[in-house]
Amino acid sequence: MWSLQDSIFTCERNHEGENIIHYLCRNGGVIDLLTFRNAINDENRYLLSEYNRDGKXCMHIVVSQDKVDPINKLMLLMKWGADINSKDQKDGNTVLHIAVLTNNYEVAKWLCQQPGVDMEIINFARKTPYQIACDRANTRMMDLLXKNGARCDVPLKINTARRRASHDYGVKLIRMGESAR
């Protein structure tokens, strides 16, 4: 009988630029992924961190695409060594950012409870998952994140901060080259 245990996968990709694990994360179930459990060894572990043409690794694909059983897929991928805090190449979003953006409360809650998850990590827009929830006025997601330990900091726009400082504290802002009157 043929075994995947000692197999080494080549770098072949499908027409969408996906390796076999990307494909199974998008189109397969947990059972399909489990078929490859013995094949994810030191020689093949790179498949978990490879990016497809959309700039997503396997974890990002699961959170953004799987509506059936994402948590069990994520558990399996993490057991194999996938990074819970890896950022996609397009927006710098982690799986927690994506769960917030897609209003996936169940996955967001589960991710928040995982050891090693960085709830304060910022994407390329310099936003934490909590700040994204705040920008979208998603109070349910904001509450979920806060209850699971997210810092509830929302940066003020620079002009808003200046106006508040000058109004609330009597601070006069002076431009370079001007003198205080």
Swiss-Prot record:
<comment type="function">
    <text>Suppresses the host immune response through NF-kappa-B inactivation. Possesses ankyrin repeat domains required for NF-kappa-B binding but lacks the regulatory regions required for dissociation from NF-kappa-B and degradation. Therefore, prevents host NF-kappa-B release and subsequent activation.</text>
</comment>
<protein>
    <recommendedName>
        <fullName>I-Kappa-B like protein C2</fullName>
    </recommendedName>
</protein>
<keyword id="KW-0677">Repeat</keyword>
<keyword id="KW-0040">ANK repeat</keyword>
<feature type="repeat" description="ANK 3">
    <location>
        <begin position="125"/>
        <end position="154"/>
    </location>
</feature>
<keyword id="KW-1100">Inhibition of host NF-kappa-B by virus</keyword>
<dbReference type="GO" id="GO:0085034">
    <property type="term" value="P:symbiont-mediated suppression of host NF-kappaB cascade"/>
</dbReference>
<keyword id="KW-0945">Host-virus interaction</keyword>
<feature type="repeat" description="ANK 2">
    <location>
        <begin position="91"/>
        <end position="121"/>
    </location>
</feature>
<dbReference type="GO" id="GO:0051059">
    <property type="term" value="F:NF-kappaB binding"/>
</dbReference>
<comment type="similarity">
    <text>Belongs to the polydnaviridae I-Kappa-B-like protein family.</text>
</comment>
<dbReference type="InterPro" id="IPR051070">
    <property type="entry name" value="NF-kappa-B_inhibitor"/>
</dbReference>
<dbReference type="InterPro" id="IPR036770">
    <property type="entry name" value="Ankyrin_rpt-contain_sf"/>
</dbReference>
<feature type="repeat" description="ANK 1">
    <location>
        <begin position="54"/>
        <end position="86"/>
    </location>
</feature>
<dbReference type="InterPro" id="IPR002110">
    <property type="entry name" value="Ankyrin_rpt"/>
</dbReference>
<dbReference type="Pfam" id="PF12796">
    <property type="entry name" value="Ank_2"/>
</dbReference>
<dbReference type="GO" id="GO:0071356">
    <property type="term" value="P:cellular response to tumor necrosis factor"/>
</dbReference>
